[in-house]
């Protein structure tokens, strides 16, 4: 589908070209500065220089010559100095945008820019045998939003949960389970037991060298594929995945694959050989395999004792993804503190000859802090675990729902509270630049009057409520004369609804879900202004009421789509 704003730009280029004054290859349409009262502009400096004419004179001549056809989305054409300004035709825009939203439905906002290409997104990636905490939630939520955004851009998207299921720590975990017994619980309680077993064994190991030897034996047995060690390790992995899945289900997270680090173990010797053969790495004096590339600090891909590290497995992971999926992009959603690691990783895989035509992207993010700005940390004893965070969010939302909507059935109130509570957590992560640290501020997160998920969800529910009231009064959605929607607040809302496809493109280009969050917030705000200034059910005429009901329906549908891109539910009632 070619959306209204795309057609508007095409109309502008065609209108300028039709004058015969400017070659097509010199026509570049841009968005004007905020102080210019227009929707798009053609800055004539470049064209005037090539043509050898005065820029202001060229703009004035074009403004006087352009004659848009009757079905064009071009309204007014004016010249201000060297700027040729174009405004949208309000009535035609209203009809075009609202018809597009109705026709496209849940697909409104999607484009085909990425058709035929594949994107791999690496996100969440918790460690096995540990509870998921708020430190995991940022990668999980940002990554899932990027999955939605790139699918909306037309890409085939592979969401991969790169589990931390390998490493020397598993020797301690297996030894601890053999010594003290396996956890008897499920879910987060089981993960807490495993953490306690690990901590207990680690503490006792400091005073008992035999325990350290035992952990080393289990680690070696696991690496060598010992059946007993592998069986115990797999039991631990399965237990951890079941616990994590409970959180993923509540957050609406869906992965295409969950390949852990262990999956790539067999590839590591070949990767090290390739790194040496390509001279991307070299053997140090102590026998370790190291790399020193692009003026980055030296780093290891194989220890002197023959052991491998995260970097080795990450190189193997890229090689596998290139062979298996042939992606145009591989995107890593990982803590900003890992920026150097990814610069080194991308440098060595390119030096090895991999991914020469592939975009390798690290999407970094900041930490979650307490209201007084302190980072949450296990060592500081202020860590918040994910399941407890979600439970707390839903409980707080339930109290608000019960207070405001006591007339709704209990089951519906519970569903609304889950949607609002989980939505608050997701939006709090996505509404600003991911590099910034975020704070858990429940009053702001659950407010229905500010920049919060609850406010956006309430705006959607208000739209649906208006449509239900219309139906109760016997006024059904019907064909309407959309050219009646000329009030300034109607036009601002329509223009903003038309921007969703542009917002999707911008969010993808910047790897920035906050662009969609900002679009949703502005939609809700503009709808609020429209609702205050333009009576819907009590409009001056039945024809205007029908047109405004169509605008309400379009707003609800578009806002639902925007929220879905963020992974947030849009309740019908609140």
Swiss-Prot record:
Keyword ATP-binding found: yes
Motif placement: 'HIGH' region: 126-136
Cellular compartments per GO CC: cytoplasm
Record Gene3D superfamilies: Arginyl tRNA synthetase N-terminal domain (3.30.1360.70), HUPs (3.40.50.620), Isoleucyl-tRNA Synthetase, Domain 1 (1.10.730.10)
One GO BP: arginyl-tRNA aminoacylation
Gene Ontology MF term list: arginine-tRNA ligase activity; ATP binding
Pfam families given in the database record: Arg_tRNA_synt_N, DALR_1, tRNA-synt_1d
Domain of life, per lineage: Bacteria
Main location: cytoplasm
Enzyme Commission (EC) number: 6.1.1.19
Cross-referenced InterPro entries: aa-tRNA-synth_I_CS (IPR001412), Arg-tRNA-ligase (IPR001278), Arg-tRNA-synth_N (IPR005148), Arg-tRNA-synth_N_sf (IPR036695), ArgRS_core (IPR035684), DALR_anticod-bd (IPR008909), Rossmann-like_a/b/a_fold (IPR014729), tRNAsynth_Ia_anticodon-bd (IPR009080)
Subcellular location as annotated: Cytoplasm
Keywords: Aminoacyl-tRNA synthetase, ATP-binding, Cytoplasm, Ligase, Nucleotide-binding, Protein biosynthesis
Catalytic activity reported: tRNA(Arg) + L-arginine + ATP = L-arginyl-tRNA(Arg) + AMP + diphosphate
Protein family (similarity comment): Belongs to the class-I aminoacyl-tRNA synthetase family.
Assembly description: Monomer.
Stated name of the protein: Arginine--tRNA ligase
Organism per entry: Chloroflexus aggregans (strain MD-66 / DSM 9485)
């Amino acid at each position: 589908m070619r959306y209204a704003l795309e057609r508007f730009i095409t109309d502008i280029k065609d209108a300028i070209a039709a004058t015969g004054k400017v070659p097509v290859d010199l026509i570049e349409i841009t968005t004007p500065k905020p102080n210019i009262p227009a929707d798009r502009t053609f800055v004539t400096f470049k064209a005037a220089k090539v043509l050898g004419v005065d820029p202001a004179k060229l703009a004035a001549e074009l403004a006087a010559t352009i004659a848009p056809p009757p079905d064009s989305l071009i309204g007014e054409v004016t010249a201000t100095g060297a700027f040729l300004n174009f405004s949208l035709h309000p009535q035609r825009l209203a009809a075009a945008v609202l018809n597009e939203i109705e026709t496209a439905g849940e697909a409104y906002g999607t484009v085909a820019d990425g058709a035929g290409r594949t994107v791999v997104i690496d996100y969440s990636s918790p460690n096995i045998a540990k509870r998921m905490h708020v430190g995991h939630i940022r990668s999980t939520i940002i990554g899932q939003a990027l999955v939605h955004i790139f699918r909306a851009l037309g890409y085939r998207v592979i969401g991969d949960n790169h589990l931390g299921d390998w490493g020397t720590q598993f020797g301690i975990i297996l030894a601890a389970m053999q010594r003290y017994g396996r956890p008897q619980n499920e879910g987060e309680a089981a993960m807490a037991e495993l953490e306690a077993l690990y901590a207990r064994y680690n503490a006792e190991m400091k005073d008992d060298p035999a325990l350290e030897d035992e952990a080393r034996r289990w680690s070696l047995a696991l690496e060598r594929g010992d059946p007993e060690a592998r069986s115990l390790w797999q039991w631990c992995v399965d237990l951890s995945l079941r616990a994590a899945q409970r959180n993923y289900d509540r957050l609406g997270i869906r992965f295409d694959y969950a390949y852990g680090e262990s999956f790539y173990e067999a590839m590591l010797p070949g990767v090290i050989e390739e790194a040496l053969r390509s001279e991307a790495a070299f053997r140090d004096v102590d026998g370790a395999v190291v790399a020193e590339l692009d003026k980055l600090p030296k780093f290891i891909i194989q220890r002197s004792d023959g052991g491998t590290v995260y970097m080795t497995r990450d190189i193997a992971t890229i090689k596998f993804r290139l062979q298996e999926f042939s992606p145009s992009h591989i995107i890593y959603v990982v803590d900003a503190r890992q920026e150097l690691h990814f610069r080194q990783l991308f440098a060595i895989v390119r030096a090895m000859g991999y991914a020469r035509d592939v975009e390798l992207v690290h999407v970094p993010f900041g930490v979650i802090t307490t209201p007084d700005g302190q980072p949450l940390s296990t060592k500081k004893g202020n860590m918040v675990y994910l399941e407890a965070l979600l439970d707390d969010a839903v409980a707080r939302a339930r109290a608000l729902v019960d207070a405001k909507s006591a007339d709704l059935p209990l089951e519906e109130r519970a569903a609304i509270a889950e949607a609002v509570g989980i939505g608050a957590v997701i939006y709090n992560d996505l509404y600003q630049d991911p590099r910034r640290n975020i704070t858990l501020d429940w009053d702001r997160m659950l407010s229905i009057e500010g920049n919060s998920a609850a406010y956006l969800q309430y705006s959607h529910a208000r739209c649906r409520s208006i449509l239900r009231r219309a139906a109760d009064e016997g006024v059904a959605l019907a064909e309407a004369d959309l050219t009646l929607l000329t009030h300034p607040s109607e036009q601002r809302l329509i223009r903003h609804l038309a921007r969703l496809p542009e917002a999707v493109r911008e969010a993808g280009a910047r790897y920035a879900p906050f662009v969609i969050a900002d679009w949703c917030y502005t939609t809700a705000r503009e709808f609020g202004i429209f609702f205050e200034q333009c009576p819907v059910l009590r409009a001056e005429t039945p024809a205007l009421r029908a047109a405004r009901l169509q605008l309400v329906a379009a707003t609800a549908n578009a806002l639902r789509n925007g929220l879905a891109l963020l992974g947030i539910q849009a309740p019908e009632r609140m």
